[in-house]
Regions:
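Short internal beta-strands
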Residues: 40-44, 131
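C-terminal catalytic/acceptor-binding lobe
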Residues: 1-6, 21, 25, 183-262
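Active-site-proximal specificity loops/subdomain of glycosyltransferases
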Residues: 44-100
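Short beta-strand-to-loop acidic/aromatic patch adjacent to the donor-nucleotide binding site
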Residues: 98-109
Length: 262
């Protein structure tokens, strides 16, 4: 049962070689028990990181094309290729003053039919960022964050599920509202910072900026997917080992230099 009505948007990005799995991901979203008002898909012509780009803005997978043409709620937007940051920032900027919900998803997951319904309901219960995949980092202070030192989501107590420092990961879907970033004004869009400190780790950037805004994160234990279609994504290529830890520490250091408080 949906608690409230309102504009709910799904936002995602993808790369050229993922067209087949993207089609399966989108299919799982258009079949949700709670349909979003719109699905925004951000693609790019220019190559960047793992993406060779969509030359001449052409989608070459016929099944993906048919799905898009058959579902008017899917909107393709061609943008500069900033890698994973396309997933949230373009839509966040467009909807900055709107009282809406933005749910980001990955392009390589067949999602549970109730994902959006559950995320929206949990938002109205907790009024914060919501995700169904993540962890509680174990540290005495944020500067000592270690991506590998954590309490996994399935082991969290009810009290631990809601915390300022919980770390959501994109595959589980992440629910945001533009107002969650308003306290620090346009900080979240400062590409001269995030492209230098965490260019491949968008989760790190949104995590640190959210903390600066003093917005909690609720990590629910509801099912979020039916099948993982991922293979060789950013984490496998760039963010395994201690890359995420290094990126977060660099980001915190830079923001502290700019007098942001944690």
């Amino acid at each position: 049962m949906i608690i409230r009505d309102g504009q709910v948007y799904v936002s995602l990005t993808s790369i050229f070689k993922n067209q087949d799995i993207l089609q399966q991901t989108l299919q799982s979203i258009v079949k949700q028990t709670k349909q979003p008002n719109k699905i925004f898909l951000y693609l790019s012509e220019d190559p960047y990181i793992l993406d060779e780009g969509f030359k001449d803005k052409k989608i070459t997978n016929p099944n993906l094309l048919k799905l898009i043409n058959d579902n008017a709620i899917i909107h393709i937007n061609w943008v500069k290729n900033t890698g994973p940051y396309r997933k949230l920032l373009p839509l966040l900027k467009e909807k900055w003053e709107e009282d809406c919900i933005i749910i980001t998803i990955d392009d390589d997951t067949i999602y549970d039919d109730y994902l959006i319904e559950n995320l929206v309901n949990d938002y109205y219960k907790h009024k914060c960022v919501v995700s169904y995949r993540g962890f509680a980092p174990l540290f005495d202070e944020l500067e000592n964050f270690d991506y590998g030192q954590r309490c996994e989501q399935e082991n969290l107590s009810c009290e631990q599920q809601l915390s300022l420092y919980n770390f959501p990961t994109g595959v589980g879907g992440i629910l945001y509202k533009p107002e969650f970033f308003h306290k620090t004004e346009k900080l979240v869009f400062e590409n001269e910072i995030y492209l230098n400190t965490c260019d491949k780790q968008d989760d790190i950037w949104f995590y640190t900026v959210r903390i600066c805004n003093n917005v909690n994160c609720y990590l629910g234990k509801k099912p979020f997917h039916k099948k993982d279609l991922s293979f060789g994504g950013l984490y496998a290529h760039f963010n395994s080992g201690n890359a995420n830890t290094v990126a977060l520490k660099k980001t915190i250091q830079k923001l502290k230099e700019l007098n942001y408080q944690f």
